[in-house]
């Protein structure tokens, strides 16, 4: 049989979907499962956005668009990024794709060369596709550790130590998946200072959760002197407007926009025209629903953090953004005799019917950081209350058995 490429062997997956398959299998068997696995809003896309898509269908907007995206969307995205970040972005700086995720690959392809030892620094724990794409594109992944003591940010001094002449790209994600951490302004300023001393490094700023900040204003690296020109801003419709299935994202960088356009031409041709017109309405239309979703997430965050900290053996920091918590379950693992977070996760699913993700689903476990699991609180208050109660009961019951 013909062989499969080594590049394909390097390609990983999103473990959230692996766990979701486990959950669906249990559901088919009639099990009662409360799931906190998937990182997508549990709201419908706002009606005005739905109506814009319906109009596009009825108006016959069914064909290809320019690979960079329709002008109306690039204009709307440029205005949105300029206003929300306090920077100057032009429509020609914008490229649209079928979701924000393709720009991870396009950015690595545009800034590194295959097999030459080019390095990409990325956050760990982090979105698993970062490391997967770095390896598959023939670059070397260099993790920078997020620490609980820093509210799940990294030490800028560690960044400076990790940059080498081979470093080509730095991936930043704030607010962050999986921890909900935010890079504070003082650290972002320190990162900018470090990058000024290392002009050979590009930056991929994954800002898909930019509108889901709860403690203070969102800070983008592009707001600091000299950073806009070398930063790829990546955003989209999925998280802010509950458009995960519409597959619509966009990136901005003046120098790389023509390169990204060629990659889109060679891979996707273009994003769905219907989704693009829906995104125009998302950016230009009323924002009441988006603000309402954000307020709901904030209330849920406060609820799940409070309840988690009442569970035996669990401590949970308050995340600054996104819709994830990253509770420390080190003591809980000891209490029930679980070797690590993955064993805890599996037992929690099979014995208590609560589905979460383990820290190892987001990269190698950070040394000396203990055991963690991820909750997505894109779930109802009732689900949060019942799910955390089940986890508490699970720990108490198994603690008694261990004793």
Description of each model-found segment:
Residues 110-134:
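Conserved PLP-anchoring active-site segment centered on the Schiff-base-forming lysine
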Residues 142, 146-215:
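Active-site phosphate-binding strand-loop segment of PLP-dependent enzymes
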Residues 57-63, 74-119:
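Phosphate-binding glycine-rich loop
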Residues 1-63, 354:
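N-terminal "arm"/small-domain region of PLP-dependent enzymes with the aminotransferase-like
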Residues 161, 337-338, 347-356, 362-403:
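PLP-dependent enzyme catalytic core of the Aspartate aminotransferase-like
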Residues 19, 36, 53, 77, ...:
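Generic structural signal for small/hydrophobic residues in well-ordered secondary structure
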Residues 280, 296-305, 316-332, 371:
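Conserved glycine-rich beta-strand-loop-beta hairpin in the small C-terminal domain of fold type I
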Residues 224-298, 302-311, 394-395:
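Conserved core segment of the aminotransferase class I/II
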């Amino acid at each position: 049989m013909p062989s499969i490429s080594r590049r394909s062997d390097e390609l990983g997956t999103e473990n959230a979907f692996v766990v979701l398959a486990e959950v669906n299998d249990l559901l088919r068997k009639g099990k009662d499962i409360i799931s906190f696995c998937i990182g997508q809003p549990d709201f419908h896309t706002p009606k005005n956005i739905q109506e814009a898509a319906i109009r596009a269908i009825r108006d016959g907007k069914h064909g290809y668009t320019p690979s960079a995206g329709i002008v109306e969307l690039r204009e709307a995205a440029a205005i949105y990024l300029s206003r929300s970040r306090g920077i100057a972005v032009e429509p020609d700086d914008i490229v649209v794709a079928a979701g924000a995720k393709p720009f991870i690959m396009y950015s690595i392809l545009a800034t590194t060369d295959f097999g030459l030892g080019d390095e990409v620094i990325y956050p760990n724990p982090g979105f698993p596709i970062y490391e997967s794409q770095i390896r598959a594109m023939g670059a070397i992944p260099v993790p920078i550790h997020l620490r609980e003591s820093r509210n799940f940010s990294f030490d800028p001094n560690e960044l400076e130590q990790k940059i080498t002449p081979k470093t080509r790209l730095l991936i930043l994600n704030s607010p962050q998946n999986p921890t909900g951490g935010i890079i504070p302004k003082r650290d972002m300023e320190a990162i900018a200072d470090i990058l000024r001393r290392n002009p050979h490094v590009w930056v991929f700023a994954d800002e898909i959760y930019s509108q889901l900040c709860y403690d203070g204003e969102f800070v983008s690296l592009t707001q600091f002197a000299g950073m806009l020109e070398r930063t790829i801003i990546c955003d989209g419709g999925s998280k802010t407007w509950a458009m995960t299935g519409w597959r619509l994202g966009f990136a901005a960088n003046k120098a790389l926009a023509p390169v990204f356009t060629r990659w889109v031409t060679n891979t996707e041709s273009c994003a769905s025209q219907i989704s693009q017109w829906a995104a125009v309405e998302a950016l230009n239309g009323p924002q009441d629903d988006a603000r309402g979703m954000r307020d709901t997430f904030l209330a849920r965050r406060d609820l799940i953090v409070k309840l988690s900290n009442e569970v035996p053996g669990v401590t949970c920091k308050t995340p600054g953004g996104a819709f994830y918590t990253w509770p420390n379950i080190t003591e809980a693992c000891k209490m029930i005799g679980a070797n690590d977070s993955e064993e805890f996760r599996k037992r929690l699913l099979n014995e208590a019917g609560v589905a979460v993700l383990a820290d190892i689903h987001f990269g190698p476990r950070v040394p000396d950081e203990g055991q963690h699991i991820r909750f997505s609180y894109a779930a109802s208050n009732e689900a949060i209350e019942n799910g955390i109660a089940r986890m508490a009961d699970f720990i108490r019951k198994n603690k008694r058995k261990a004793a």
